[in-house]
Amino acid sequence: MKAFFAISASTLLATVHGHGYLTVPASRTRLGFEAGIDTCPECSILEPVDAWPNVTEAQVGRSGPCGYNARVSVDYNQPGDNWGNEPVVTYKAGDIVEVQWCVDNNGDHGGMFTYGICQDQELVDKFLDPDYLPTEEEKQAAEDCFLQGELKCGDVDGQECEYSPDCGEGEACYRNDWFTCNAFEADSDRGCQGVDGAELNSCKTTIAGGYTVTKKIKIPDYTSEHTLLRFRWNSFQTPQIYLHCADPTIEGGMEVRMRMIVMHGSFGVDTQHSFGHSFGFQGEGVYRAYRYIRGVAIIQMNLNINASLLPQPTLPIRGWSTRNIQHT
């Protein structure tokens, strides 16, 4: 169980240094660090908050889902010259991918961590506009969406998904959908650095050297030309949460979804338009889908149509028209 210490926020800041940040895929924080703008990438901290044992209770406030570094006055929820303007990695729906963060040797607070993808593109787009800083309400709405779109440990077959040794059964933190660090006071392989058991300086921090923390996640059945992968680490030792984002592209989700539509007819109803007929698919290839708002075409996603989709019976789909699909 977690011991209670009466300690002021000012004392905490004076005595505890170095923490952690997302490194793979390259987070906005990592890119800021590599550009020489962020002098302490492991220091984007949401504090003081109730981080434990209820790991989802705290509001993200100014930090938002992508983090705010008060040391350098950088808000990563808004794209800058060196981050957020374009994707840094391309995934395919259903991929199993390795993700990694870096914990500082002088700030390994133990606890639990998670990853998420928000599938509300309209909301995510607010974090992709270099001319707009999301409000705190929008930041919290996005974080709620990331929690809803959690990429669970158990989504990856064969991955060990244990309960935190610093959390007791019946506590809110007693869950194994999140990833856990090792016991905070373990004699060896302690805390988050014990997850990989890597060498000191296996990743870069600015305080005392870093240790990698590596896991695997499954990319959801979702397609986006530019979205966000959010990393969140809740500290066990301190009232702190660390939030970071990376900017991926996700391809291929719509192909799977369309196959489900054809086979099961489980999508919406629009009697005017039907898949494979009114849309005029002309064979295998990539088609570009558009959504029209007030007569202006807004790109929605790419559709990878293969032969297994084409000969199926046509079914109606809501919200699309003949002009919404163009062959590239």
From Swiss-Prot:
Q: List the disulfide bonds.
A: 40-43, 66-245, 102-203, 118-145, 153-161, 167-173, 181-192
Its uses in biotechnology? Starch-active PMOs provide an expanded perspective on studies of starch metabolism and may have potential in the food and starch-based biofuel industries.
Cofactor(s) the protein requires to work: Cu(2+)
Family statement drawn from the similarity comment of this UniProt entry: Belongs to the polysaccharide monooxygenase AA13 family.
Q: Name one GO biological process term.
A: polysaccharide catabolic process
One Gene Ontology term, aspect cellular component: extracellular region
Q: What is this protein called?
A: Lytic polysaccharide monooxygenase aasB
Keyword Secreted listed? The answer is yes
The highest taxon in the source lineage is Eukaryota
Function in brief: Lytic polysaccharide monooxygenase involved in breakdown of granular resistant starch.
This chain is glycosylated at 54, 306
Pfam families recorded: LPMO_10
Tell me where the signal peptide lies: 1-18
Q: What happens without the gene?
A: Impairs degradation of resistant potato starch, but has limited impact on less-resistant wheat starch and no impact on processed solubilized starch.
According to its UniProt record, this protein's enzyme class is: oxidoreductase
| Annotated residues for binding of Cu(2+) | 19, 109, 242
Q: Mostly located where? A: secreted
The alphabetical list of record keywords is: Carbohydrate metabolism, Copper, Disulfide bond, Glycoprotein, Metal-binding, Oxidoreductase, Polysaccharide degradation, Secreted, Signal
The enzyme's E.C. designation = 1.14.99.55
Tell me where it resides.
Secreted
An annotated Gene Ontology molecular function: metal ion binding
Question: Would I find Secreted among this entry's keywords?
Answer: yes
Catalytic activity field: starch + reduced acceptor + O2 = D-glucono-1,5-lactone-terminated malto-oligosaccharides + short-chain malto-oligosaccharides + acceptor + H2O
What does the entry comment about cofactor binding?
A: Binds 1 copper ion per subunit.
